[in-house]
């Protein structure tokens, strides 16, 4: 008596339909556990929380919401999602600390990490996208310095800019930037093995034999250079 039945389906925006549990959230939203992650439904939106980024595993068995925190039991362990108010500055500080502590940065460049198993852990990759990743970091530091005037941020921008310039100066072709630079004697990460068009990667040694630079630079890498370096000049 006085009850109502509501059906939520994929056609209504539900990201995944195979539900396992329901829970009322801390802001009167609905949490839905599924065999492929968890879903938060607000009045007119669905937020999806998948395995390995938000949760230890896919299958959700139960959900309990506390004060701005949600506990999600999965077949891989307990996932905890906590809601915290963030300013842009606080968010930037979080990711900058992540870059420093996890080892993304090297010689002014910003690199991708990949998981190499329990024995090796996270491994830094010297890859085709080093120039692009570094360009975006440089752009971010330029914008941050323009807003804050912080001297440490200026030094970060200068360090990344010098790495971008090095990519261009290490090649014998004026104006042509390398994709990546590998230290023959010092680097212990993973060197990219693939080149453009399905061909194997090729490293070109510098005259002193201490470095190798990777060519086959693509248009998006070149665009990244123009984008970041122009910001560095203007800001």
Report each predicted region and the residues it spans.
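Short loop/turn segments that connect beta-strands within beta-propeller blades
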Residues: 2-4, 42-45, 84
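Conserved beta-propeller blade signature
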Residues: 29-32, 69-72
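Extended ligand-binding groove/face enriched in aromatic
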Residues: 105-107, 111-117, 127, 155-235
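Well-ordered alpha-helical segments within folded domains of soluble proteins
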Residues: 34, 74, 129-145, 218-233
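Short loop/turn segments immediately following beta-strands, especially the blade-tip
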Residues: 82-89
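Loop/turn residues immediately N-terminal
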Residues: 1, 35-39, 76-79
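General structural concept
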Residues: 121-166
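Short coil-to-beta transitions that initiate beta-strands within beta-rich domains
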Residues: 7-27, 50-67
């Amino acid at each position: 008596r006085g009850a109502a039945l509501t059906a939520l389906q994929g056609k209504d925006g539900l990201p995944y339909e195979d539900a396992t549990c329901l829970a009322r959230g801390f802001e009167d939203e609905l949490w839905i556990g599924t065999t492929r992650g968890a879903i938060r439904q607000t009045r007119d939106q669905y937020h999806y929380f998948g395995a390995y980024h938000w949760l230890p595993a896919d299958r959700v068995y139960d959900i309990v919401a506390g004060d701005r925190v949600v506990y999600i039991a999965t077949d891989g362990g307990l996932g905890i999602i906590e809601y915290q108010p963030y300013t842009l500055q606080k968010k930037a500080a979080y990711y900058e600390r992540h870059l420093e502590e996890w080892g993304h940065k090297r010689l002014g460049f910003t690199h991708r990490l990949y998981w190499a198993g329990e024995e090796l852990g996270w491994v830094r990759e010297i890859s085709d996208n080093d120039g692009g990743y570094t360009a975006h970091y440089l752009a971010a530091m330029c914008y941050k310095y323009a807003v804050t005037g912080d001297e440490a941020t200026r030094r970060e921008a200068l360090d990344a800019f010098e790495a971008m310039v090095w990519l261009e100066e290490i090649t014998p072709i004026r104006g042509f930037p390398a994709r990546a630079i590998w230290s023959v004697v010092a680097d212990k990460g993973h060197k990219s093995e693939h080149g453009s068009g399905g061909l194997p990667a090729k490293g070109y040694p510098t005259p002193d034999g201490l470095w190798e630079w990777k060519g086959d630079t693509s248009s998006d890498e070149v665009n990244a250079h123009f984008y970041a370096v122009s910001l560095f000049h203007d800001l």
